[in-house]
Each structure stands twice: as structure tokens, then as C-alpha cells.
Amino acid sequence: MTEFSSKERYTMIRVLVIDDSATMRILLKKLIDKNEHMECVGVAPNPVAAQELLRETRPDVITLDIEMPKMNGLDFLDRIMRLMPVAVIMISTLTEAGSESALRALELGAIDFIAKPKLDFAEGVQAYAEEIYRKIETAGRAKVKKLTRDVPPVRMDAEPPAKPLLAEAGKDGRVVAVGASTGGTEAVKELLLSLPADCPPLLIAQHMPEPFMRSLAKRLDLLCAMRVKMAEDGETLRRGCVYIAPGHSNLTIDATAAGYVCRIVRNAGEAQSDSSVDELFRSVAAAAGARGVGIVLTGSGSDGAAGARAMMAAGAFNIAQDAETSVVYSMPDAAIAACGINEVLPLEKIAGKLMELDGA
């Protein structure tokens, strides 16, 4: 009888590493090959050197550095997503420039990104091992779409258009809570682009580190009719305003005599907790009850499922993005399984349903 290794008993995720740092290439290869469900099928110092490897190895996932000689990661990403779409995870620095580049990569079709460690390089990558494994596993089962049109870059140095400051949201109005993870930045953007300037207040919990959240808020504010900003503790919710949870904190709301206020709960680490969507949803259930609307967008894991159930128990109306338009369906699917969803819709129909509920 033939004996198989533990790796051979599973469908392996084949990973190609492209990074100009020899240290990063060695460490990523070592980490990937330690995981029994993954195999590093090749490493390359730049996209030019990677082109032949890409054809030969046909990887399931690519980890791609952004800043590299000969051809930068964004140009290479644009090319491969048009010609040979594959799940790509970007490797980005935790800086404003790195954050903007990572968000641009997501626009071009990258599945996710991993932030480079700030401190001791080897120790930092070792500490990120579980995140690397989780994101590669998610990318390995993600829905990859071919890039079929030009995606103009957002001019981040532009001034946002003037937007009127609308009235505070009273307790008789709708309050919308949105949760997302993998694939969520583009889903959130599409949702917001479909909403009018006077929509009910939206609160967004998106699994991303702090610098990326600031860049996301700025980018969305330039693109959308509503005001988009980082949520601040104690500020009153207004119509026409989108409040994004800081990457290092959970966002919740409290009810006051006049309306609702944001509450920011700082976490011990640099990232939101794994239950940031649940925390937001539970607070909306308690504060807004039947005037709440919950939206669970594409994402990995089950964050939001328990919170969606709490919102539904309080009388709220909850929407899940459908499998067809989700990059990763885990979060919507978990919320549906928890009996926390009223309606499942393709992404392009969620804004219309939200405005229908706002008028009800």
C-alpha cells in the first residue's frame, strides 16, 4: 500500500513569493513550507524574474511586494489580473504611502494584504505566521475576477468636494451598521457609491490595521456623495455621514435623549478585535432596536453572525451579500446560518434596499 505524507493527503495551496528582499523571501518560504496545507513553489526577486515561474508553476496564490526594482508590484498586478488572474496577497508597509498602495492593489483585484512588521524583521515575520497562514488559506478559496476594464487611480492629494452638514440623526431614523473583511474595501466602496448624500448614518467595521483605515476613509470621502470620516468618541450621528471604525479600536454606539453617539473602545493591540463587527451590531441592537439595519458583506470568518442575530432579535432588518458577488462568503454565510439575516442580495442591490427601508 502506498504511503502518503501528511502534506500529500490534503489539497495543497501552491504559493509563489515575489519580493526584492532576500530575507523576506527566505522567511516567507520557510513559513509556507512549514504549513502542511501549503507549498512554496518558487521565489523571485522581482516581477520580471517571476514571469517564467508564474507560467511554469501555476500557483494558487502569489504574495507580492509593492515596491520592487524593474517593475513595481502594482504594475505587475494590473498585468496578471488582465492576462492570468490569480489570488494575490500584497506585502505592504504600515505607512501612509504603503496604505494607499495597498488600497490601490485591492482596486486592481488583489484579495488581501499583509503589513510588513515594523521592528526586528525576522521576529516580526515569525509573529505574523498565523496571519500569513490565515490569509493564504482564505486567498486559496477566494473568488478571483479577471480585470476587464481600466481602474483610474484616485488622486489622494485632491480636496474632497464640499458636502453639506446634515441634521443629526434622531431616534426615529434608521441607523445602519456594516461589517466586512476580505474583499470588503471594494464592496464597501461600491455600496457607498450607490447611496445618496442624505442617506441614514452608516457605521463601518472593516478588518484592517489603523493606517489603512485612515487611507480608506480619505479615499472614500473623495469618491462618495456622503461625508466619510474616522469615527470619534462622543460624536453625534448625522444623516449623510459614514463613520469608519479606527483600526486599533472597536466602534459602538449609545442612545441619547436626542439621538445616537459613537463610542470608541481602544484594544490592547494595534488591531480591532476579531469580534469588531459583533460588537458594533450588538450596540446597534441595544441602542436602535427596530430602527437598525445590519449589512454583512464579503469576508472570512464568522464575525458579525452573533451580532446580526442580536439585531434581528431587537427587531432590526439585516441584509447579507450573496455568494455570487462575495470574494469570500464565510461572513455572510455564518450570519445566515445563525438565523440573523432577513434578506440575501447581490451587492449592487443592497443600496436600493437600504433606501427603501429608510423610507419605511
Curated annotation (Swiss-Prot):
Residues 169-360 form the CheB-type methylesterase domain. Pfam families: CheB_methylest, Response_reg. One of its GO terms (cellular component) is cytoplasm. InterPro entries: CheB-like, CheB_C, CheY-like_superfamily, Sig_transdc_resp-reg_Me-estase, Sig_transdc_resp-reg_receiver. One of its GO terms (biological process) is chemotaxis. It is found in: Cytoplasm. Its main location: cytoplasm. Residues 14-131 form the Response regulatory domain. The active site is at residues 181, 207, 303. SMART domains: REC. CDD domains: CheB_Rec (cd16432), REC_CheB-like (cd17541). GO terms for molecular function: phosphorelay response regulator activity; protein-glutamate methylesterase activity; protein-glutamine glutaminase activity. Its EC number is 3.1.1.61, 3.5.1.44. It catalyses: [protein]-L-glutamate 5-O-methyl ester + H2O = L-glutamyl-[protein] + methanol + H(+); L-glutaminyl-[protein] + H2O = L-glutamyl-[protein] + NH4(+). Phosphorylated by CheA. Phosphorylation of the N-terminal regulatory domain activates the methylesterase activity. The modification 4-aspartylphosphate is found at residue 65. Keywords: Chemotaxis, Cytoplasm, Hydrolase, Phosphoprotein. Involved in chemotaxis. Part of a chemotaxis signal transduction system that modulates chemotaxis in response to various stimuli. Catalyzes the demethylation of specific methylglutamate residues introduced into the chemoreceptors (methyl-accepting chemotaxis proteins or MCP) by CheR. Also mediates the irreversible deamidation of specific glutamine residues to glutamic acid. Belongs to the CheB family. Contains a C-terminal catalytic domain, and an N-terminal region which modulates catalytic activity. This is Protein-glutamate methylesterase/protein-glutamine glutaminase 3. It comes from Burkholderia thailandensis (strain ATCC 700388 / DSM 13276 / CCUG 48851 / CIP 106301 / E264).
